[in-house]
Amino acid sequence: LVVQRTGWGKSAVYFVATVLLREGWGDWRPGTPVPVPGSRGRPGGLGASVIISPLLALMRDQVAAASRAGIRAVTMNSANVTQWEEIQTQVAAGEVDVLLVSPERLNNPVFRDDVLPHLAASAALVVIDEAHCISDWGHDFRPDYRRIGPLISSLPSGVPVLATTATANDRVSRDIAEQLGFALAGVPTPEVYVVRGPLSRDYLRLGVLTLPEEGQRLGWLLAHLGELLGSGIIYTLTVSAAEDTASVLRAAGYDVLAYTGKTDADERAAAEQALKENHVKALVAT
């Protein structure tokens, strides 16, 4: 279990590990032939690493980051069901280094019964990203993450399991480790190695402004959004509030976009990119 702050390089850990394992370094011992670089996907070698990630936006970021590092990554999610068969063929042929799936896929009958057994049998590595979602003590508990336990239990002996998070306090970390350890060993006492670093970041600030009325909050945004440096995210409680807030801010001249469950998938991806590149002042999201 790796608990390190955002930007520490957790994704680099599993990307590098994937390459080393798929090229044969996991079995290498001094005095034996050195694995050949670029030999990923060789016959009889390890299959793709499986990364469980909770959000499509995170998956897109990880696929892009993997591509920049020369790693072949694909996703199987609710938005590309028609491509699942093609992706399965690519994985079976050793053409994929990393397969990203959402925890909800673990409860999909087709994925669970037809896809998952083959992945588990040959996986180089299993990664649970945003692992705080496993714990009901965590701020972002996802019930579907509880289904990861049976996946881990079904893995062949020796398949490494890595969990990563940037937002787990000590209690959440202990809960994650206990659950992973039980899934791995089938006993309450876990055998999980925990790497934990400082999570605070000096550039983050937290401020609280009490504005009980919706009109007051919108008025504050209209008056002060332009004074805030850079781009950011404005969170609202409902889809309608996000759309209404974005509409009012745009009418006032602010370059903002609504980002909700009703937003088209292509529009979401474009909005994410616009935010990262500071082409919009803010996304108004739920």
Describe each model-derived feature in a short phrase:
Residues 1-22, 36, 41-49, 53, ...:
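Helicase motor core with emphasis on the C-terminal RecA-like subdomain
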